[in-house]
């Protein structure tokens, strides 16, 4: 079992340390998303170390499809495969099965679906998801869950929560078996359960109570940031937070904007991930301490300033807005790389500043100063 140490609190906000076999994670933390064991935009693991990334997130579904989890197992696991010596979290594949896969059919055993790449029929259930993640040898494995569309009818959401709980029990049992095998690469692989229930607070609370009884290594809130208003997301967090174990990390999946993250930390969340910093960067949409910047706007065509004068990332230390904008306009790979590096640097710096504010007992002031500013347009 991993150890989560709660160092300080301010209101519901938490400052902690999460000790794993691949190193200690300082929380709150943002996990950089490398879907296929790489971040799009030409960003290497060397870059990730330089910008302060603590945890990398990779995608079980995509790695199972290509290059195959058995190949990664034969290469010594995901850490050796892409030369990363810090924690890696792999999602269960559930979200992709329910959002990308074609012709899916859900049963109590799992999900039959067609690959979005070649149409090949695939079956994935709790045991298969755990086996794939064990082959990947990630630090943290996510339980296999049903990702229900939002909005969903109450009755369906309730039945789905019950099925997801039964799947979680099977995940826990299968992980215990896999971690005991002599051929398993990471015998200390951790398991996080996922809270579901759409935006129905009674379902969310009941589900969190039930999964908390299983004494897992961490607890995620899933099925949010899928189109519902931000206030509904915050309401769900507030509803389930009292029932999430205090001595375990809380992870809000797929979130989000800097403002979303600040709001969620304020409500007691420790872990975050999102493709937004890299995806937005590839289109010239950048995050700064002054607010959001669209680098492709005409006003930046002759701007000699860096993306942000208060930023220490490689792009801001060396290049102007005008130059990076030019690179994006001519589809030069360097432009996308510099923008991705900037956004990832900003997200990791945001988390470092949040931790510093919690350490110093001034998070409330930090929150008030930046919660609206980060959403403004520069």
Roles of regions detected by a PLM:
Residues 1-17, 25-34, 41-42, 145-151, ...:
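C-terminal extensions of enzymes
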Residues 1-185, 298-301:
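Non-catalytic, usually N-terminal nucleic-acid engagement modules in DNA/RNA processing proteins
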Residues 23, 56, 91, 133, ...:
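Conserved, mostly hydrophobic/aromatic
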Residues 23, 164-171, 211, 240, ...:
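Hydrophobic alpha-helical packing residues
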Residues 128, 132, 159-170, 206, ...:
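A non-catalytic, amphipathic alpha-helix used as a structural packing/dimerization or gating element
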Residues 150-153, 158, 218-224, 333-336:
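Glycine- and acidic
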Residues 162-165, 174, 178, 186, ...:
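Glycine-rich phosphate/ribose-binding loops and adjacent secondary-structure elements
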Residues 174-184, 248, 354-366:
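Surface-exposed helix-capping loop/turn segments at secondary-structure junctions
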């Amino acid at each position: 079992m991993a150890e989560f140490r709660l160092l300080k609190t301010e209101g519901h906000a938490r400052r902690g340390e999460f000790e794993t076999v691949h190193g200690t994670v300082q929380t709150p933390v943002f996990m950089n998303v490398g879907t296929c064991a790489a971040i799009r935009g030409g960003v290497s693991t060397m870059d990730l170390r330089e910008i302060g990334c603590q945890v990398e997130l990779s995608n079980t579904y995509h790695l199972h499809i290509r290059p195959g989890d058995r190949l990664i197992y034969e290469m010594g696991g995901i850490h050796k495969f892409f030369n990363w010596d810090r924690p890696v979290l792999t999602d269960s594949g559930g979200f992709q099965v329910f959002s990308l896969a074609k012709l899916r059919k859900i049963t109590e055993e799992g999900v039959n679906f067609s690959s979005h790449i070649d149409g090949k029929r695939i079956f994935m259930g709790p045991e298969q998801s755990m086996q794939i993640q064990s082959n990947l040898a990630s630090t943290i494995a996510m339980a296999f869950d049903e990702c229900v569309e939002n909005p969903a009818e109450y009755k369906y959401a309730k039945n789905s929560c019950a099925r997801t709980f039964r799947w979680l029990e099977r995940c826990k049992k299968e992980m215990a078996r896999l971690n005991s095998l002599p051929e398993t690469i990471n015998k200390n692989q951790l398991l996080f359960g996922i809270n579901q229930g759409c935006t129905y607070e009674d379902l969310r609370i009941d589900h969190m109570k039930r999964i908390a009884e299983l004494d897992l290594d961490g607890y995620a809130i899933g099925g949010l940031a899928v189109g519902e208003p931000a206030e509904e997301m915050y309401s769900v967090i507030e509803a389930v937070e009292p029932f999430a174990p205090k001595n375990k990390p809380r992870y809000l999946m797929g979130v989000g904007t800097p403002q979303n993250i600040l709001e969620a930390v304020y409500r007691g969340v420790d872990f975050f991930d999102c493709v937004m910093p890299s995806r937005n960067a590839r289109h010239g949409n950048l995050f700064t301490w002054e607010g959001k910047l669209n680098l492709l706007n005409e006003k930046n065509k002759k701007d000699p300033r860096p993306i942000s004068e208060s930023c220490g990332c490689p792009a801001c230390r060396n290049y102007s807005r005008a130059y990076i904008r030019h690179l994006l306009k001519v589809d030069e790979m360097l432009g996308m790389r510099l923008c991705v590096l900037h956004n990832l640097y900003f997200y990791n710096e945001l988390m470092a500043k949040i931790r510093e504010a919690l350490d110093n007992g001034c998070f409330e002031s930090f929150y008030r100063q930046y919660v609206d500013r980060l959403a403004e347009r520069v």
